[in-house]
């Protein structure tokens, strides 16, 4: 889970994209709402190989649904599904008109989401609304004359609109019926302006029930009822915390509303309420999600989407009675004929091996996945390189796809130690098999180096239901050896908390270790990782949450780290910085990492993480220059059950030189700094034969140091450098495709210093699905004449940091007692004294 400081978000993002070459931009960047990685996955429709959205036909016998980015029709009691659309974009969220003639749906194409209308009688498919905005959740009025939907056309914010439709065409412009309102509330995950989503019509068409966070700080809001006209009267009929997926549906009897809720539990299930709210009760049960419910026309059945088996699936529930059945497309009739293509991936030894695959149509840029695979996609991309975001899936070694005739780009990767394979394949009318053999770039485990992702969330409110078994499969496909599944709250719920035991997951193997640990959330001090916990999750798992009983800034992170260490934990800060704060210009931050670095309560920094790597590296370098020895770790912050995610499992990873793969030995080597962190380039670095984490003690005088460096990378880089005390002291020339280099560099040492090796690109570059490729080693420390490493300027930087932080903390309104405040201010004071002494 990502943390932003109080620096201006617009400035921060601008700095990030400028450094990344201003190429890579978020999917659907016209949405002007913060924390896009949450609403994009939890609210916006996504390409999934299983069903994602369902609507009933005119009667009880027919269902229409989205699947694989196209629309389908299937009889309730049938086994054959008929495809109704076939691109060129991705089609979602069908809703059938009351007379059964039209489907209105949302279609992602041309860098926007438009509304389209499909005439089920003639087959004519035509645009209904294309305004360059994101238009979703279309719903027909009961008389078939209007469509209610949600659009970002007003200033990029979520509002409900209505559109009059006559004879299959829009009649007039859309009308915004919800009123824009600046709440002035300190919302951490949501926009300051209220949002309005998920409309559903009353049976007489005069009112809507919808979801809004008006007046609330946490969650996407409660259930509201309003007149279906601009500025209509609106009242809240029920409140509970929701996160984008409530999606109420009003029964035609006018009395009942079905919706999806996680009230008091970790998973969404179906609940019933009255049209005035009443006292809702739970209708379905299970440790998985049931979402997107829709009443049948006579209110005797409910169709919905479930992820009970991992992937999304379509179900129908009888009410009353409770009989539940899965609607399975056992045979598929495609709108455009398709041909079977089988992909077989083998290791250098010729054995089948798991890998990550991507199949993209050259003509349309559209991605395809097997029917039984989880479709996943990057959440940002360069529009000059592709029409849609990069899509991929994990394969166990053999995967079969049904594809329209045409030319496809097949891309195969397996972590960072195997070369990327890219092939162009022509698909004709005959079934075919395409074989892919992967080649190694490096075999780091043979040298005692084992990769790990220190920041993974197995389940975090995404489309899919992940399990340790599937997480292990994902890790094997990414050639990842250690997975730290960090249990963390998503507002009130804490997915995966039931998996914590204090031990390795029993599905771990000799080459893949899974540990369930914790990310500690605070809306103030900065997020952190607690690894290797033996006894318990630290609860409550958050602090500084306004308007809750956890509003206090105590426990601060120092207290949390002490609690973690008391049970053998290893502690670190995660996804740190988007920019380097300049305190001389009045910039501020709440981030507490300098406190814990000074007090010795943290063991590593996530230098490669969900942040700007060069900015984080620059702050880390300042810290190293004060004499603090803190190694680099790495973590993706991968939401492993998402369909749209910022990075796949293992995108950001740390390689640890533990010799053998043993969890506790691996953590000990991490703490000792025997690491390098990367999202692409692989590094080897030694100084006078000593590797990262080591110290070289030399007498007073001038000394020659011999650096041996190596680079192997699946992605080209622009710079390959040796850094001493934050300054480049050796630049290694890169030739050819700039993915490999070996060199010996002579350096001179006359004073104490730390040395790292790094490689990076100055712009986003495929196949690294990050702001830009970057890697750095932890330092080798050189001590000359017993003198400490010191920079008074950098020490003063942290004194200024703590001065502004102390002032903010002192005036915080959430303290439970003066004793709490004094304890925390005391921690800041001790840390300030540490840096002040080094500033002299």
Where do the language-model regions lie?
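Bacterial N-terminal signal peptides that target proteins for export
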Residues: 1-8
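Catalytic cores of extracellular degradative/oxidative enzymes
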Residues: 449-632, 636, 642-643
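Sequence signature of WD/YWTD-type beta-propeller architectures
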Residues: 23-340
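C-terminal functional module detector
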Residues: 348-365, 371-376, 382-392, 397-401, ...
């Amino acid at each position: 889970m990502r943390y932003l400081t109080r620096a201006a978000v617009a400035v921060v993002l601008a700095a990030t994209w400028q450094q990344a070459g201003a190429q890579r931009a978020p999917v659907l960047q016209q949405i002007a709402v913060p924390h896009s990685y949450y609403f994009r996955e939890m609210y916006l429709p996504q390409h999934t190989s299983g069903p994602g959205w369902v609507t009933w036909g005119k009667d009880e016998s027919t269902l229409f649904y989205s699947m694989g980015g196209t629309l389908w029709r299937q009889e309730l009691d049938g086994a054959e599904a008929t495809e109704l659309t076939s691109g060129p974009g991705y089609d979602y969220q069908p809703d059938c008109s009351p007379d059964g003639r039209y489907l209105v749906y949302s279609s992602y194409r041309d860098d926007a989401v438009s509304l389209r209308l499909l005439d089920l009688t003639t087959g004519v498919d035509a645009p209904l609304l294309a305004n360059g905005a994101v238009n979703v959740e279309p719903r027909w009025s009961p008389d078939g004359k209007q469509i209610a939907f949600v659009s970002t056309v007003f200033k990029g914010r979520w509002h409900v609109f209505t559109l009059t439709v006559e004879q299959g065409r829009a009649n007039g412009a859309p009308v915004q019926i919800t009123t824009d309102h600046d709440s002035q509330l300190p919302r951490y995950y949501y926009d300051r302006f209220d949002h309005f989503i998920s409309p559903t019509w009353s049976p007489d068409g005069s009112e809507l029930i919808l979801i809004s966070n008006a007046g609330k700080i946490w969650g996407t809001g409660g259930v509201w009822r309003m007149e279906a006209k601009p500025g209509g009267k609106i009242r809240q009929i029920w409140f509970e915390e929701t996160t984008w997926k409530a999606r109420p549906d009003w029964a035609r009897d006018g009395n009942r509303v079905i919706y999806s809720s996680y009230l008091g539990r970790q998973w969404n299930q179906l609940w019933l309420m009255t049209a005035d709210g009443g006292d809702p009760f739970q209708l379905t049960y299970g440790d998985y999600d049931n979402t997107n419910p829709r009443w049948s026309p006579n209110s005797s059945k409910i169709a919905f989407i479930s992820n009970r088996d991992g992937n999304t699936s379509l179900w129908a529930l009888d009410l009353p009675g409770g009989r539940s059945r899965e609607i399975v497309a056992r045979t598929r009739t495609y709108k455009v004929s398709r041909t079977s293509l089988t992909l077989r991936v083998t290791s250098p030894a010729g054995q089948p091996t798991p890998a990550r695959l991507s199949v993209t149509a050259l003509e349309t840029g559209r991605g395809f996945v097997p029917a039984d695979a989880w479709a996943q996609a990057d959440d940002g991309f360069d529009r000059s390189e592709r029409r849609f975001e990069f899509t991929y899936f994990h394969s166990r070694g053999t995967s079969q796809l049904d594809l329209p005739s045409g030319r496809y780009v097949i891309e195969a990767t397996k972590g960072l130690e195997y070369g990327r394979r890219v092939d162009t394949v022509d698909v004709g009318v005959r079934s075919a098999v395409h074989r892919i053999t992967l080649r190694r770039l490096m075999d780091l485990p043979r040298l005692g180096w084992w990769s790990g992702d220190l920041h993974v969330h197995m389940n975090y409110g995404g489309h899919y239901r992940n399990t340790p078994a599937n997480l292990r499969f994902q890790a094997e496909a990414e050639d990842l050896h250690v997975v730290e599944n960090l249990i963390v709250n998503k507002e009130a719920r804490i997915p995966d908390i039931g998996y914590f035991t204090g031990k390795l997951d029993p599905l771990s193997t000799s080459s893949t270790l899974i540990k369930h640990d914790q990310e500690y959330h605070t809306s103030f001090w900065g997020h952190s990782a607690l690894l290797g916990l033996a006894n318990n999750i630290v609860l409550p798992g958050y602090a500084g949450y306004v308007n809750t009983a956890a509003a206090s800034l105590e426990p601060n992170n120092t207290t949390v780290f002490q609690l973690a260490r008391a049970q053998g934990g290893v502690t670190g800060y995660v996804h740190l910085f988007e920019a380097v704060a300049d305190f001389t210009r009045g910039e501020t931050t709440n981030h507490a990492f300098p406190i814990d670095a000074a007090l010795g309560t943290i063991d590593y920094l996530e230098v490669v993480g969900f942040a700007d790597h060069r900015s984080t590296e620059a702050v880390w370098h300042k810290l190293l220059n004060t004499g603090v020895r803190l190694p680099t770790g790495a973590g993706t912050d991968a939401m492993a059950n998402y369909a749209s995610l910022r990075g796949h499992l293992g995108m950001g990873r740390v390689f640890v030189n533990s010799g053998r793969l043993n969890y506790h030995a691996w953590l000990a080597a991490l703490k000792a700094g025997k690491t390098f962190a990367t999202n692409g380039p692989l590094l080897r670095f030694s100084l006078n034969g000593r590797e990262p984490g080591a110290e070289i003690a030399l007498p007073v005088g001038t000394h020659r140091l011999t650096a041996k460096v190596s680079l192997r990378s699946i992605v080209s880089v622009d710079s390959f450098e040796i850094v001493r005390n934050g300054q480049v002291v050796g630049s290694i020339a890169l030739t050819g495709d700039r993915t490999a280099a070996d060199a010996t560099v002579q350096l001179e040492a006359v004073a104490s210093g730390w040395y790292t090796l790094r490689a990076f690109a100055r712009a986003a570059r495929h196949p690294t699905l990050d702001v830009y490729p970057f890697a750095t080693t932890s330092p080798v420390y050189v001590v000359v004449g017993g003198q400490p490493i010191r920079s008074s300027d950098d020490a003063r930087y942290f004194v200024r940091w703590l001065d502004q932080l102390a002032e903010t903390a002192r005036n915080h309104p959430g303290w439970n007692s003066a004793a709490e405040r004094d304890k925390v201010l005391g921690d800041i004071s001790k840390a300030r004294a540490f840096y002040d002494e080094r500033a002299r």
